[in-house]
């Protein structure tokens, strides 16, 4: 099966980007170096092609009701131009995906952004439940119709201002229609880096126009991963996977994205888990010894395996090896001393409150 390519693929290859497969897409992993790109976002601004993320539009009289019953947060309460972070769970409360849901400025359409490679799966899920519940909603997988670019960093909003695009009035998780380099865009004050910034959604044909107008460091998936890990953000396929690592929002530390005042697929199971408390939870780990924890490495306490690393890296900002992983709740208190097995050797590690960087 051939890989999907983003609208900016030619621009990336012309720039000499190193490419990698991710979620069925061929995407840039780095342009210059992960460290250069990471530091640009922490210190000034960087731009990311995130067109591999899905865009699913839901419209019709029951669009809000359908989306509210399939996501863990209170989507029905969104005002036009507002967005929220939510999980998508099965009957057991297990995360199938995490997403940002927008109520578009027109007030009539909802847009949600599933992770790379999940767009058609999630579109079909919405259609199936609309039929099952006899809800009047139209579900359109618009992933191939749009390009999506993230502009992140402390100077991101000033950079847009230099293009006569003012978004300082937008609060976090607010979106508005703006014109960038002559292109109509949906601009939201959201991101996946732990920095301020925006994400821009616009028609595919205008991708190179918008990309070239944003005069800052291009960044690939490598820096996107180190940045999100420092911020303690989840990565689907690592921190949760319904097949290989089934986790609930409470286990994955995104209970803030669950509103049990709404009724959704999995809400009964999650209400029960919140009452009882999860047996395991995601924690941050900072290694004390030389070595880098990686996905799949064992976490040990007093020589016994108690958990597994889901993501790990050498943090460019902190100058330390950091990781995320699941352990029983008795080991989740910050300051708890554990170890990670790296190449057969136990490396001392300490549980650290998330995020690592804020």
From Swiss-Prot:
It catalyses: N(6)-[(R)-S(8)-aminomethyldihydrolipoyl]-L-lysyl-[protein] + (6S)-5,6,7,8-tetrahydrofolate = N(6)-[(R)-dihydrolipoyl]-L-lysyl-[protein] + (6R)-5,10-methylene-5,6,7,8-tetrahydrofolate + NH4(+). The keyword Transmembrane does not apply. GO terms for cellular component: glycine cleavage complex. It is an enzyme of class 2 (transferase). One of its GO terms (molecular function) is transaminase activity. Its EC number is 2.1.2.10. Keywords: Aminotransferase, Transferase. GO terms for biological process: glycine decarboxylation via glycine cleavage system. Belongs to the GcvT family. PANTHER family: AMINOMETHYLTRANSFERASE, AMINOMETHYLTRANSFERASE, MITOCHONDRIAL. The glycine cleavage system is composed of four proteins: P, T, L and H. The glycine cleavage system catalyzes the degradation of glycine. This is Probable aminomethyltransferase. It comes from Natronomonas pharaonis (strain ATCC 35678 / DSM 2160 / CIP 103997 / JCM 8858 / NBRC 14720 / NCIMB 2260 / Gabara) (Halobacterium pharaonis). The gene is gcvT.
């Amino acid at each position: 099966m051939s890989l999907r390519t983003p609208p900016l693929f030619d621009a990336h290859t012309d720039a000499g980007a190193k490419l990698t497969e991710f979620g069925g897409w061929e995407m840039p992993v780095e342009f210059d170096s992960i460290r250069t790109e990471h530091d640009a976002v922490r210190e000034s601004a960087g731009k990311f092609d995130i067109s591999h993320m899905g865009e699913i539009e839901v419209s019709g009289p029951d669009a809000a009701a359908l989306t509210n019953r399939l996501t863990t947060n209170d989507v029905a309460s969104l005002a036009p131009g507002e967005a929220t972070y939510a999980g998508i769970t099965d009957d057991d409360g297990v995360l199938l995906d995490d997403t940002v849901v927008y109520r578009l400025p027109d007030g009539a359409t909802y847009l949600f952004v599933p992770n790379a490679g999940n767009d058609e799966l999630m579109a079909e899920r919405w259609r199936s439940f609309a039929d099952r519940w006899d809800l009047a909603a139209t579900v359109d997988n618009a992933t191939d119709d749009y390009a999506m670019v993230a502009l992140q960093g402390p100077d991101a909003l000033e950079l847009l201002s230099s293009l006569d695009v003012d978004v300082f009035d937008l609060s976090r998780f607010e979106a508005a229609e703006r014109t960038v380099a002559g292109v109509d865009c949906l601009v939201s004050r959201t991101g996946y880096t732990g920095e301020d910034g925006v994400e821009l959604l616009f028609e595919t044909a205008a991708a190179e126009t918008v990309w070239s107008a944003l005069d800052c460091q291009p960044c690939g998936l490598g820096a996107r991963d180190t940045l999100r890990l420092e911020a303690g953000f989840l990565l689907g396929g690592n921190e949760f996977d319904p097949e290989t690592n089934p986790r609930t929002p409470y286990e994955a530390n995104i209970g803030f994205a669950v509103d049990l005042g709404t009724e959704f697929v999995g809400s009964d199971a999650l209400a029960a888990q919140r009452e009882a408390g999860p047996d395991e939870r995601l924690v941050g780990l900072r290694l004390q010894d030389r070595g880098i924890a990686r996905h799949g490495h064992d976490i040990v306490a007093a020589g016994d395996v108690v958990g597994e690393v889901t993501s790990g890296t050498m943090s460019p900002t902190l100058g330390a090896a950091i990781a995320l992983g699941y352990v029983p709740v008795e080991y989740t208190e910050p300051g708890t001393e554990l170890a990670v097995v790296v190449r057969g050797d136990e490396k001392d590690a300490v549980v650290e409150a998330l995020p690592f960087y804020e």
